From Swiss-Prot:
Protein origin, superkingdom: Eukaryota
Protein's gene: flower
UniProt-listed InterPro entries: TVP18/Ca-channel_flower (IPR019365)
Site (Calcium ion selectivity): 79
GO CC field: cell projection; endosome; presynaptic membrane; synaptic vesicle membrane
Keywords tagged on the record: Calcium, Calcium channel, Calcium transport, Cell membrane, Cell projection, Cytoplasmic vesicle, Endocytosis, Endosome, Ion channel, Ion transport, Membrane, Synapse, Transmembrane, Transmembrane helix, Transport
Oligomeric and partner information: Homomultimer. Associates with the dally/ magu complex.
A GO biological-process term: bulk synaptic vesicle endocytosis
SMART domains, per database record: Cg6151-P (SM01077)
Protein name (record): Calcium channel flower
Similarity-based family: Belongs to the calcium channel flower family.
PANTHER family, sorted: CALCIUM CHANNEL FLOWER HOMOLOG (PTHR13314:SF2)
Keyword Transcription regulation: no
Taxonomic path: Eukaryota, Metazoa, Ecdysozoa, Arthropoda, Hexapoda
GO molecular function: calcium channel activity; identical protein binding
Length: 194
């Protein structure tokens, strides 16, 4: 058994479909899940640190810490539902989110990560919520998909526009056919030089 198969076996849930699809490499699929688990752990830890800032009478940091801890629990619930065995509906919620497109998860993670940073800008909120934000960015990049092959990009670049005329590739090609190039030789006659 290879190292990749061991990692995929550890991170796969029972009866789990492949929601991301075969086009994503294994290290991106499971790396994003690992990043989400680590981000959730640190968000909960640093959210607790922000909650202790009530000692300095900073209510906004208290609220930011609570939001950050809730965001950490939500990310942990979605990325590793095995951590919440005592709740019966966790797998249902995780499967429902897994069935949605990846940009939904990316938007959810990014939206949950921004408020604690705005409310209490500091290293604890920046690092804890920043990891959740990074997980959302990784899922967003996965939602965009892979770049096309070189042959596909060349074929798309050589397609004709308007039927018979090939695409123009010189420097003077513009949107308007009769457009004149800019002249940088002198000032315009109506310029007041002010």
């Amino acid at each position: 058994m290879s190292f990749a198969e061991k990692i995929t076996g550890l991170l796969a849930r029972p009866n789990q479909q492949d929601p991301i699809g075969p086009e994503q490499p294994w290290y991106l699929k499971y790396g994003s899940r690992w990043l989400g688990i680590v981000a959730a752990f640190f968000a909960i830890l640093f959210g607790l640190w922000n909650v202790f800032s009530i000692i300095t009478l900073s209510v906004s940091c208290l609220v930011a810490g609570i939001i950050q801890m809730v965001a950490g629990f939500v990310v942990m619930l979605l990325e590793a539902p095995c951590c919440f065995v005592c709740f019966e509906q966790v797998n249902v919620i995780a499967d429902k989110v897994d069935s949605k497109p990846l940009y939904f998860r990316a938007g959810l993670y990014i939206a949950m990560a921004i408020p604690p940073i705005i409310l209490c800008f500091g290293l604890a909120s920046l690092f804890g919520s920043g990891l959740i934000f990074g997980t959302g960015v990784v899922y967003g990049m996965m939602a965009l998909g892979k770049k096309a092959s070189a042959e596909d990009m060349r074929a798309a670049a050589q397609q004709t526009f308007g039927g018979n005329t090939p695409a123009q590739t010189n420097d003077r090609a513009g949107i308007v056919n009769n457009a004149q190039p800019f002249s940088f030789t002198g000032a315009v006659g109506t310029d007041s030089n002010v």
